[in-house]
Amino acid sequence: MATSAPLRSLEEEVTCSICLDYLRDPVTIDCGHVFCRSCTTDVRPISGSRPVCPLCKKPFKKENIRPVWQLASLVENIERLKVDKGRQPGEVTREQQDAKLCERHREKLHYYCEDDGKLLCVMCRESREHRPHTAVLMEKAAQPHREKILNHLSTLRRDRDKIQGFQAKGEADILAALKKLQDQRQYIVAEFEQGHQFLREREEHLLEQLAKLEQELTEGREKFKSRGVGELARLALVISELEGKAQQPAAELMQDTRDFLNRYPRKKFWVGKPIARVVKKKTGEFSDKLLSLQRGLREFQGKLLRDLEYKTVSVTLDPQSASGYLQLSEDWKCVTYTSLYKSAYLHPQQFDCEPGVLGSKGFTWGKVYWEVEVEREGWSEDEEEGDEEEEGEEEEEEEEAGYGDGYDDWETDEDEESLGDEEEEEEEEEEEVLESCMVGVARDSMKRKGDLSLRPEDGVWALRLSSSGIWANTSPEAELFPALRPRRVGIALDYEGGTVTFTNAESQELIYTFTATFTRRLVPFLWLKWPGTRLLLRP
């Protein structure tokens, strides 16, 4: 009770006479009375004159209103005493925990000194050090910073929303991609199952045809065997009778010689065809089907492997590397050989002696594929004539019957002369082997000046093609397919695998594979010394 009376007395001293509450931001007017700043603004002037004090009724000027800092600090201390009345000694109040206190005066910090950038209590604000400085209420000083923080917070929230949106969209894209992969998995299984079913049906169909041909051949074999046995039995009977007749005495033999011989006239012995013409035609057609099957499966396997394993690339030629003997098209995908050297300026990257040219695009990794088309005047006509000759030979073979008359055909002098002419033509073709072209890959750092061997040790992996056949440009040179002239050569480069594979792009037939360890950039390589021939890059 002793301590509560002084506290109540102090509370009465710091109570505003207008709002009857603690003085908030206390100010004094001209008469000396003290009120809350907000309460003085509510005091209205009487009959248009200056406002008057609510206690003494003396007029005052609002511009003379001055803050009372010490009284504001006293109000805070009274409030703290009132709160700390039931607190144990040494216990820190919640307000002291939540609010920072002035280290010097242990008062609550209310102001912010804009000159020093420090937080001040009421006593620091009235001190000689900070009185001439500009000090504002801490909440007012914090407002611009709070607005900046709120603006930055708004930006961060927008960024967060964007990230969440991106994340949601990305998650949706991933789920869609996974769904697409699942659909593709089902598609692959279904397509391959359909392909397997189709191949199984074709297999069963071919095996049924084969079984029918086997049955027809077996039945024909029995007929052929039975006919032969009957013919042999007939001949054996005639031979036996004639042998007996030949052993008779002359007198007996001469009695009915004419009649006997008339009973057994000389007949041409039977020469039957072991395979009927119809069956032979069917077997030939079946063999053609198997060849078509083999060719189709090879082409399918080659194309599927190429499309799935290798990336088909479009390559062009580098005009700066082209020899003066070569002429490039405007799109740099076609090269033609000219016998005259047309380059007026020798570029440092240009081939000077060898009629070669490199590709403009190089490869240092991956599996890539492109094709080179060889256009040679007269090749198509020659091949068509060759196809017609082969068809004629097949027709002649089909027209041949059985065993004939039991004699073999021997070569005549004319045949020997024709063979000799063919040998002379082969020798002439060997002499013309210099007219050829090369297709393949090469290191972009290969030598380009002087005479070159153009072999793997020089950084070139290529095939040489001519009218006489195909050679692998190895050391020594390896002849691959004599007289084979592919119109399109496929080049498959597996950089990491260290292989360069050449195929017939039309039939997918393997021609040759180089193996090496690649460490430099590789580019397409063409070499052409063959008048009337063009090399075109595809696609």
Swiss-Prot record:
Residues 188-227 form a coiled coil. GO terms for cellular component: cytoplasm; nucleus. Residues 380-434 have a biased composition (Acidic residues). It holds the Pfam family zf-C3HC4_4. Residues 376-437 are annotated as: Disordered. Its EC number is 2.3.2.27. A zinc finger (B box-type) spans 97-138. It catalyses: S-ubiquitinyl-[E2 ubiquitin-conjugating enzyme]-L-cysteine + [acceptor protein]-L-lysine = [E2 ubiquitin-conjugating enzyme]-L-cysteine + N(6)-ubiquitinyl-[acceptor protein]-L-lysine. One of its GO terms (biological process) is protein K11-linked ubiquitination. PROSITE patterns: B302_SPRY, ZF_BBOX, ZF_RING_2. It is found in: Cytoplasm; Nucleus. Autoubiquitinates upon viral infection. In turn, autoubiquitinated TRIM26 recruits NEMO and bridges TBK1-NEMO interaction. Keywords: Coiled coil, Cytoplasm, Immunity, Innate immunity, Metal-binding, Nucleus, Transferase, Ubl conjugation, Zinc, Zinc-finger. Zn(2+) binds at residues 102, 105, 124, 130. The keyword DNA damage does not apply. Belongs to the TRIM/RBCC family. E3 ubiquitin-protein ligase which regulates the IFN-beta production and antiviral response downstream of various DNA-encoded pattern-recognition receptors (PRRs). Also plays a central role in determining the response to different forms of oxidative stress by controlling levels of DNA glycosylases NEIL1, NEIL3 and NTH1 that are involved in repair of damaged DNA. Promotes nuclear IRF3 ubiquitination and proteasomal degradation. Bridges together TBK1 and NEMO during the innate response to viral infection leading to the activation of TBK1. Interacts with TBK1; this interaction bridges together TBK1 and NEMO in order to activate TBK1. Interacts with INCA1. This is Tripartite motif-containing protein 26. It comes from Pan troglodytes (Chimpanzee). The gene is TRIM26.
